[in-house]
Regions:
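Short intrinsically disordered terminal tails
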Residues: 1, 224-225
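Nucleic-acid nuclease catalytic cores
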Residues: 66, 82-109, 113-214
Length: 225
């Protein structure tokens, strides 16, 4: 799965710094929410992403949450593999899957899953619960269905992963730290066929804004969260 195929090519880097530099040349999974806009509460607005990719911003230093998430990722991935012995879970460090159809779109998955003849993406998250209202909005049952939610910015990211890979499903595997210190593991599964309309819409938005601002070298407007 970490091999060149008709859908994507695989680029491997010698260091994390080299990988970070390569991310300036296109749209990565963590950029997707910024392209969608402030309604999905991205970590950065599109102007900040534009400045990052143009080399106009200072390198971002790890904060405590980022370091914790990166340290927990291999442990979470191993836990998931143990909990799902019928699945093969693979991972390759400092690599990038690049879409053949749209080379400006790439993805660095936390893992890839083989389940019989189905291929999936593994996405690992850590989440600190601060308020009950926000937790219910991000992870609770939707008011109009029996489906459980995930944060909007994570949903944009997994859609982006499906666009690049063409895979059948995504698993979001999250370690939640509650305000009293106890932990909870959450799994959310999404089949590609359930999100086809969302995939088309994200592709349209990403391609339109990539051409309008990044290819044309036009500074995007400041979006207020």
């Amino acid at each position: 799965m970490y091999k060149d195929n008709p859908v994507y090519t695989v680029k491997t880097f010698s260091s994390r710094d080299e990988w970070l530099e390569a991310r300036k040349r296109g749209i990565g999974g963590s950029d997707a929410a910024s392209f969608v806009g402030p309604d999905v509460k991205p970590f950065k607005n599109l102007l900040q992403i534009w400045q990052d990719k143009k080399g106009l911003s200072k390198p971002q230093l790890d904060n405590e949450a980022m370091a914790y998430g990166r340290d927990m990722e291999p442990l979470m991935r191993d836990m998931f593999a143990i909990d799902h012995p019928d699945m093969i879970v693979l991972h390759k460090e400092d690599c990038m899957l690049v879409s053949r159809e749209d080379p400006h779109r790439f993805y660095s998955p936390d893992g890839l899953i083989l389940h019989g003849d189905r291929k999936g993406v593994y996405e690992c998250k850590t989440y600190r619960r601060r308020t009950s209202a926000q937790y219910e909005k991000d992870w609770g049952i939707q008011w109009n269905s029996l489906e459980h939610s995930i944060p909007d910015k994570y949903f944009c990211q997994i859609l982006h992963g499906l666009l690049v890979t063409g895979f059948d499903f995504v698993v979001v595997h999250c370690l939640v730290t509650h305000s009293d210190g106890h932990h909870e593991i959450i799994e959310r599964w999404f089949d590609r066929e359930e999100v086809e309309d969302d995939l088309e819409e994200l592709k349209r938005i990403e391609d339109e804004k990539w051409e309008k601002y990044f290819v044309a070298d036009v500074k995007p407007p400041l979006e207020v969260f």
